[in-house]
From Swiss-Prot:
InterPro entries: Conotoxin-I_CS (IPR013141), Toxin_19 (IPR012624). One of its GO terms (molecular function) is sodium channel regulator activity. This is Iota-conotoxin-like R11.15. Expressed by the venom duct. Iota-conotoxins bind to voltage-gated sodium channels (Nav) and act as agonists by shifting the voltage-dependence of activation to more hyperpolarized levels. Produces general excitatory symptoms. Signal peptide: none annotated.
Length: 42
């Protein structure tokens, strides 16, 4: 399913769709950041 992410509450199906939500839940601006993933959200 999709989850809200980011300050604007955008919905996304993949981490990379939404400023790369990392495992910590912090959004990063690029997939090149350590810990970011393009895995699907559960």
């Amino acid at each position: 399913g999709h989850v809200p992410c980011g300050k604007d509450g955008r919905k996304c199906g993949y981490h990379a769709d939404c400023c790369n939500c990392c495992l910590s839940g912090i959004c990063k601006p690029s997939t090149s950041w350590t810990g970011c993933s393009t895995s699907t959200f559960n």
